[in-house]
Regions:
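Membrane-proximal intracellular helices of multi-pass ion channels
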Residues: 1-464
Length: 464
């Protein structure tokens, strides 16, 4: 009994960062063990423990790198388990726990509300349950609409049952930014010229990448316009600073990435050079969007030019926005770093944008998250190079960048990974999924609790 009480007390003392870290690890292990069971593997195939753990990790971390072909290797039971893991990874463990409490009609304690607050990196505790409910409504609603759009193409092609199953799986995978599909080894390549599949995928990826807070902010302003309380032309001006930064960064990255990919590869016959002008632009748009943590592709990654390769590395690292399903260091992190750089070059003490000042704690959080991701990227790239000396360095860097940013794109290296390489990528995906969220939350909360007048003596050092 004493041991049970000690265990309970230890679990009760866990902070948000520890809950997220242990929670993801626990679900990954459980999912891996389930996928390792014989009934999950299709006849004629064998699933090693490493491949089962790799698949569970890539699913719960909504990455999309796969060592086996999902469409043929797994049975229906295995595919359902993968889909559930993707949905859990997209919803988030904290939201999932809240769902269980709500469904059981149990009251969420003050401590658990604090966990929800810190996991979403929010300043106030009010409305936490409403927040989780809104997340679920938005997520399942968007996935449902996406499934209907995909069904328009998949049902005529594959039949009612299989087409409907493919539609639901692809919609969930696209919205959760997992990039796992049931269409075979070539992802969505057969639909490179199909507007329905392309724009449905792009729409789901961008919507989830914006983050739920931005959705609600825009919806709130639209309601005010409908009620006649706000002119249409002043919607953007009345948005929260967070929403303004996210929308501006997303627009710049999507449009800028599309234009640059088109310019770099429009004459490349290996990638998009042989397509019609409209298909070239559509393929460029898809590549620009999917590199920001989606993982689907309509053109094989190794076919793009070196310039597009470098651009994709940058887009993968940036990723999506907070409070969404995307990975990466996040658009707001990059914006804060760039604004901080601008302020320092101009000799300003404060970081300002849209007539607002950004807190120092958020600047520190942005630095920590970026530093952590770059550190993991460098270390894991070296380890994978050591484990697979025969692999080209550009493929290794692309693989690790994709893993740490939970993107899921590969230049063909994933199926060729040896056992050591697979475990390196598993660890990278795990660190990439829990790292930015955990460290960003921990640093911000800790900074807010520190006394403002607590300082040590200063001493000069040389920089640059």
């Amino acid at each position: 009994m004493n041991k049970k009480m000690q265990l309970y007390n230890r679990l009760h003392k866990l902070n948000t960062a520890q809950i997220i870290t242990l929670g993801f690890a626990g679900v990954i292990i459980l999912g891996g063990l389930l996928l390792w069971l014989p009934f999950c593997t299709a006849p004629g195939y064998h699933t090693s423990f490493t491949d089962a753990m790799f698949t569970a990790t890539t699913s719960i971390c909504v990455t999309g790198l796969v060592t086996v072909v999902t469409a043929t290797h797994w049975t229906l039971a295995g595919k359902i388990i993968i889909l559930v893991l993707i949905q859990i990874g997209g919803v988030g463990l904290i939201s999932l726990g809240s769902i269980i409490f709500i469904s059981l009609r149990k009251k969420i304690s003050l401590r658990n509300r604090r966990v929800i607050q810190e996991s979403y990196n929010m300043d106030r505790m009010g409305g936490m349950v409403r927040l989780v409910k809104k997340v679920l409504i938005c997520m399942f609603g968007a996935e449902g609409i996406g499934a209907v759009c995909y069904a328009v193409r998949f049902i005529p092609q594959f039949g009612l049952a299989k087409g409907l199953g493919y539609s639901v799986f692809t919609a969930v995978s696209a919205f959760c930014n997992a990039g796992i599909d049931l269409l075979g080894e070539d992802s969505l390549a057969q639909y490179v010229a199909d507007p329905i599949v392309n724009f449905t995928s792009v729409g789901l990826i961008i919507m989830s990448g914006l983050g739920f807070v931005v959705w609600w902010d825009i919806w709130d302003k639209i309601k005010r316009v409908i009620r006649g309380k706000l002119p249409v032309g002043r919607i953007f001006k009345n948005l929260r600073l967070h929403s303004k930064i996210v929308l501006m960064m997303t627009l710049i990255l999507v449009v800028g990435g599309t234009v640059l990919i088109f310019l770099f590869d429009h004459g490349n016959p290996e990638s998009i050079g042989t397509y019609s002008p409209g298909t070239k632009w559509m393929a460029s748009l898809f590549q620009s969007v999917t590199t920001r943590t989606a993982g689907f592709f309509t053109v094989s990654q190794e076919r793009f030019s070196n310039a597009t390769y470098m651009l994709c590395l940058i887009l993968m690292l940036i990723g999506g926005s907070p409070m969404g399903t995307a990975g990466g260091i996040k658009t707001t992190t990059v914006a804060v770093l760039l604004l901080s750089l601008k302020s320092n070059l101009q000799g300003k003490r404060d970081v300002e944008v849209h007539h607002r000042r950004i807190r120092d704690s958020y600047i520190r959080s942005a630095i920590v998250v970026t530093g952590m991701v770059l550190t993991v990227l460098i270390l894991m790239s070296m380890l994978l190079c050591a484990a697979m000396p025969e692999a080209p360095i550009e493929d290794v860097v692309y693989e690790i960048t994709s893993a740490v940013a939970t993107v899921g794109l590969s230049r063909g290296l994933t199926p060729c990974l040896n056992t050591a390489g697979k475990w390196i990528v598993i660890l990278t995906m795990y660190l990439g999924r829990i790292g930015p969220l955990t460290l960003g939350t921990a640093v911000t909360v800790r900074a807010q609790k520190m006394p403002a007048d607590s300082h040590l003596a200063e001493e000069d050092i040389m920089i640059g």
